[in-house]
């Protein structure tokens, strides 16, 4: 979880900012000016309020900036049970906003020739890193039957190259964390983590966890910054 957080914030959003593209509001790390609230009010009341309000601001012509130097502190989930409720809420909220707002972002992006709005639609639509890895593995297994086929044989090698690229990016994330050794040890949980995370995404896509916000208790007494 720490690795994907570093990749999302320290690499993806920071990279978007460096080339002039916009970020998204990210829960604990949101910072809004009073003039924004006076002009737009607060219109997001779903379980994915950060995604929802991000889209409302973008469609309203506002800019969302990512500050790579900012740090937020929060108590992270301590086990799979706590994390399941939290991740299901996040996934369900994102899919709800995706279903109702992606087309509006793309349409306005085309009408206004705004690459940034179209990129924001892609950000909302794209699977998370763990889902990308799971789907790439499924592609590799499924394309195994095509090895040696003169026409479809390339699909296996394409899937293998995709997995290698995702794995390399993940390794970059490991060595970008504050405790690379601990992150490396966590690799033993990957065979459990990927199916668990993909299940969360599928349930979120079906609408589970969308009715109640419901923050879960944290057993740890210390706070750790999970977003940078």
Q: What residues fall within each predicted segment?
A:
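Long helical/loop segments within the catalytic core of UDP-sugar-dependent glycosyltransferases
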Residues: 1-44, 88, 95, 99
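Catalytic core of nucleotide-sugar-dependent glycosyltransferases
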Residues: 3-10, 84-105, 134, 196-204
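Catalytic donor-sugar/metal-binding loop of nucleotide-sugar-dependent glycosyltransferases
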Residues: 45, 54-73
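Nucleotide-sugar-dependent glycosyltransferase catalytic core
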Residues: 76-92, 182-184
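Alpha-helical membrane-protein architecture signal
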Residues: 80, 84, 114-121, 188
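Loop-to-transmembrane boundary segments
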Residues: 110-130
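Membrane-embedded multi-pass helical conduit in multi-pass membrane proteins
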Residues: 123-208
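Short linear elements at protein peripheries
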Residues: 210-228
